[in-house]
Curated annotation (Swiss-Prot):
Belongs to the bacterial ribosomal protein bL19 family. One of its GO terms (cellular component) is cytosolic large ribosomal subunit. PANTHER family: LARGE RIBOSOMAL SUBUNIT PROTEIN BL19M, RIBOSOMAL PROTEIN L19. NCBIfam families: rplS_bact (TIGR01024). SUPFAM superfamilies: Translation proteins SH3-like domain (SSF50104). This is Large ribosomal subunit protein bL19. This protein is located at the 30S-50S ribosomal subunit interface and may play a role in the structure and function of the aminoacyl-tRNA binding site. InterPro entries: Ribosomal_bL19, Ribosomal_bL19_CS, Ribosomal_bL19_sf, Translation_prot_SH3-like_sf.
Length: 121
């Protein structure tokens, strides 16, 4: 990529994004503009994919709302993202968790939780 493009992108990239991996349960605070008002909307779900590099990096977060699966593709460095919180770390063996789309009921949101060294002590 051109050096000038890299410089412009580096200036616009966010530094407050936590380390996230597929299988993590996230809370994404999204700014929503309705008329002349602006409010925060919370979207909590499982991170099922990460794609792209740099400014074009996006994440796909999936949740079950009233028995219906809802997925949201979110650009990571977008100004509409207020903050991203990691609720819990998931232990998965895949980079893309598209198989979660075929699950129903409780199994649709069930992922093993990753244990850390601080929890073991």
């Amino acid at each position: 990529m051109n050096e000038k493009i890299k410089l412009v992108e580096a200036a616009q990239m966010r530094a407050d994004i936590p380390e996230i991996h597929p299988g993590d349960t996230l809370k994404v605070h999204v700014k929503v503009v309705e008329g002349d008002k602006e409010r925060l909307q919370l979207f909590q779900g499982i991170l099922i994919s990460i794609r792209g590099v740099g400014m074009s990096k996006t994440i796909t977060v999936r949740k079950i709302s009233h028995g219906v699966g809802v997925e949201r593709i979110i650009p990571l460095h977008s100004p509409i993202i207020e903050k991203i919180e990691v609720v819990k770390r998931g232990k998965v063996r895949r980079a893309k968790l598209f198989y979660m789309r075929n699950r129903t009921g409780k199994a649709a949101m069930k992922i093993k939780e990753k244990t850390t060294n601080s929890e073991m002590a």
